[in-house]
Amino acid sequence: MNENDAYLFDVELPTSWTFPVGKTWIAGWFISKTGAQFRDLRLRIDDRIFAGIFGQPRPDIELRYRGYAGLPHAGFCFQVEPHRGAKLLRLEILDHGNNWAELWRQPIKAPRGIRRRQPVL
């Protein structure tokens, strides 16, 4: 679990940051400690952006850390397929002022067996 004065969160999956060939899931939860509303989460692998699902019910986490289960729900997940040679994963959050801020970063390894090139954006 990661925590600061404003929020706490955890990335529960995957348990290893060496990715298999193909698609994989990244999942966890995020809770504001101040009552601030956050609008979205996104994930970056190097310069590629992945949209995910933010706001999945996690009553176990919501009850434990917030004292009630319900909106805003804490869970999130992303399905990603890291490109060959991918090195860095970053989780970013969108605040109510429409500003993206880095929440967390993790070095990663993508196997050499992935033949697709990183798409040009």
Regions found by a protein language model. Name each.
Residues 1-121:
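Basic, ligand-binding patches in group-transfer machinery
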